[in-house]
Design a protein with these regions (language model features):
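A structural boundary/capping signal
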Residues: 1-130
């Protein structure tokens, strides 16, 4: 779970403008490695059905997918922005349920096991904030 953070640290070693250095330092300070679990481990059956039949997650729409899930269940699901390695780091959105993290884009839209990838969150937001 360190390659995304190492990438940020390597960027800070480059000859950057002060604003760029400040950006990467803020990113590094906010970075929190997380582990993704299967949605079925933390969601109820009706929530899983809602994802499949109402949200209908789509590939390349992680921000939309995660946002809609947070809005559907605002009392228990947070929206997260960060990065994942697949195998290169990409900006990505996923969700937090209690103390667990899920990725409905990888799991439902791409039919992949997201737990095999490295994830880092830079921010976790409730429905009112996003």
């Amino acid at each position: 779970m360190e390659s995304i953070i190492k990438e940020i640290e390597m960027m800070m070693e480059l000859p950057l403008h002060e604003r760029q250095k400040a950006y990467f330092q803020d990113l590094l300070n906010a970075a929190k490695p997380v582990t993704i679990v299967p949605a079925a481990d933390v969601l109820e059956d009706y929530e899983l059905d809602y994802i499949r039949h109402v949200i209908k997650p789509k590939p390349k729409e992680c921000y939309r997918n995660s946002h809609l899930l947070c809005e559907a269940f605002p009392e228990r699901i947070l929206y997260c922005e960060g990065k994942t390695n697949v195998p290169i780091p990409i900006d990505h959105a996923f969700n937090k349920v209690g103390d667990a993290y899920i990725d409905i884009t990888f799991e439902f839209a791409l039919h992949e096991n997201p737990s095999i990838y490295e994830y880092v969150t830079f921010g976790e937001y409730d429905a009112k904030t996003i």
